[in-house]
């Protein structure tokens, strides 16, 4: 999973959609914040340079055709699994 910065938006975002830049050029992202309380949907994540808490319940669809963005980092496989499980848990009931 890639960590990106989106033009005109503060902070970092974690791309949680499977195909980051597929034919639709859209991505589902979750914001990353530096400080908030931890709970099952707020998961710590870090790359080589970026560290924060992913707010899994705040997913957004972003059309990257109309927004500037840049890739800044990536997270490990184990972090990816934890975040994917949390997001999947939102929809399992």
Predicted regions, residues:
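Conserved functional hotspots at enzyme active or ligand-binding sites that engage polyanionic ligands
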Residues: 1-93
